UniProtKB/Swiss-Prot annotation:
SUPFAM superfamilies: Uracil-DNA glycosylase-like. Keywords: Cytoplasm, DNA damage, DNA repair, Hydrolase. CDD domains: UDG-F1-like (cd10027). This is Uracil-DNA glycosylase. It holds the Pfam family UDG. HAMAP family: UDG (MF_00148). The keyword DNA repair applies. It is found in: Cytoplasm. GO terms for molecular function: uracil DNA N-glycosylase activity. Belongs to the uracil-DNA glycosylase (UDG) superfamily. UNG family. GO terms for cellular component: cytoplasm. The active site is at D59 (proton acceptor).
Length: 218
């Protein structure tokens, strides 16, 4: 199974013309993130056959030079967003990795699908592209991963992500959940939750190679 087939199946099942038309207008008349060519970067960097872990985000960062198509990740020269800083703090506490760069492309290439449930946003307006159709698309992506893959780790931080559990066959996949790494909630159960070592322990238990969460130039 490949993304091209899954995309075909989804667009055959659902009509996204209204969303397409909306996005054409938005990109023509407003500043929208990420750039058009990066909307689907999560799928470009993580082929379907390579998926070992799915980390769900919400919508892209809405500031300049941040979003580039991967949930929680920002472009190499951007400042660290607070949630990502907390993710790295937990990573250091969990498995001793100290990451210096704010982008997660190496995770994506390792097999971590960094999926936002909404893939675009207008500059400076969080959630501005909610309910235009992206949730239908990404719900189908989650279901496809659940249906066609086995032994995938789904990391679900915060209530919106955890609402997607209903789309996942928990009998053949691993669910790791906690509060969101946002500064508003990180001290209420994200710190100390050890998602990275737990994910690798599960992958190794089912005969898969672990994720290299540490800094990589690959």
């Amino acid at each position: 199974m490949e993304w091209s087939q899954i995309f075909h199946d989804i667009t055959t099942k659902h009509d996204f013309k209204a969303m397409h038309d909306f996005l054409e207008k938005e990109y023509s008349t407003a500043i929208v993130y990420p750039d058009r060519e990066n909307i689907y970067q999560a799928f470009d960097l993580t082929p379907f056959e390579n998926i070992k872990v799915v980390i769900l985000g919400q919508d892209p960062y809405h500031g300049p030079n941040q979003a580039h198509g991967l949930a929680f990740s920002v472009q190499p020269n951007a400042k660290f967003p607070p949630s990502l800083r907390n993710m790295y703090k937990e990573l250091a506490d969990d498995i001793g990795c100290v990451r210096q760069t704010p982008h997660l492309q190496d995770w994506a290439r390792e097999g971590v699908l960094l999926l936002n449930t909404v893939l675009t946003v207008r500059q400076g307006e969080a959630n501005s592209h909610r309910d235009i159709g992206w949730e239908t698309f990404t719900d189908e992506i989650i279901k496809a991963v659940s249906d066609y893959k086995e032994h995938v780790v789904f990391i679900l931080w915060g209530k919106p992500a955890q609402q997607k559990i209903k789309l996942i066959d928990t009998s053949k996949h691993c669910i790791i959940k906690s509060v969101h790494p946002s500064p508003l909630s990180a001290y209420r159960g994200f710190f100390g939750s050890k998602p990275y070592s737990k994910a690798n322990a599960y992958l190794e238990s089912v005969g898969k190679s672990p994720i290299n969460w540490c800094e990589s130039e690959a």
